[in-house]
A protein has these predicted regions:
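Cytosolic-side ends of inner-membrane transmembrane helices, especially those
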Residues: 19-26, 152-168
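Alpha-helical transmembrane segments of integral membrane proteins
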Residues: 8-16, 145-156, 160
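Extracytoplasmic
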Residues: 33, 38, 42-49, 88-140
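Extracytoplasmic ligand-binding sensor domains of the Cache superfamily
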Residues: 49-103
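Juxtamembrane membrane-water interface segments immediately C-terminal to a transmembrane helix
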Residues: 22-47, 58, 62
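Membrane-proximal alpha-helical signal-transduction linkers
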Residues: 166-182
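Interfacial "cap-and-anchor" motif at the non-cytosolic start of specific transmembrane alpha-helices
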Residues: 30, 138-148, 169
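Extreme N-terminal signal-anchor transmembrane helix of membrane signaling/transducer proteins, especially
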Residues: 1-23
């Protein structure tokens, strides 16, 4: 009986560890979605800055570059199970941004404006990929937890059945026999 209970405890420990790992990675997903979503607004703001106050463009480019290279976005790229679509989307944004930042530095407002809608669509695609990945991880986590709970329930049910068969019934028989002897 002790062996079975020990297996249940080990199994619960493994499940808890896996769940914590998945939940920890989901925490960074929300931050990645927020930062990548802010890239859209920042790129539009940069266009406005180019038109109204060109002397602040370089400062805004640095801020944008910091957001684009945020640690959480780089971490998503290196996650073991990150889909190739996320990685490709991020690389596409990085490549496109090189061109967009060149337009901004050269104050080529028309070229920047002409590419902006397409660039923002690429950012939207990246955000959508991040959201889908986060949703998949959440579904996997919930599925693993449900299956694990069912397995634990099955193991505990087996232990209870085993105890009834191997411990309770023999004790009942011994009690009956001792009552008959008395």
């Amino acid at each position: 009986i002790a062996k079975y209970l020990f297996v249940v405890i080990i199994f619960m420990g493994i499940i808890s560890s896996l769940s914590l790992l998945v939940m920890a990675s989901n925490k960074s997903d929300a931050e990645a979605i927020n930062i990548s979503g802010s890239l859209r607004m920042q790129s539009y703001r940069l266009l406005t800055e180019m038109e109204r106050s060109p002397n602040t463009v370089e400062q805004n480019l640095v801020r944008y570059q910091d957001s684009l290279n945020a640690n959480v976005l780089l971490t998503v790229q290196n996650q073991l199970f990150a889909p190739s679509g996320i990685k490709a989307s991020y690389q596409k944004i990085l490549q496109r941004w090189m061109m967009m930042s060149d337009f901004a530095r050269a104050h080529q407002i028309e070229k920047y404006h002409a590419e902006l809608k397409s660039y923002v669509q690429d950012v939207d695609d990246f955000v959508l990929e991040l959201q889908r990945f986060a949703e998949k991880k959440w579904i996997i986590a919930v599925s693993v937890l449900c299956i694990s709970m069912l397995l634990i329930l099955a193991m505990v049910s087996y232990v209870i059945w085993y105890m009834k068969r191997e411990v309770v019934k023999p004790l009942e028989l011994m009690t009956k026999a001792s009552m008959q002897v008395q």
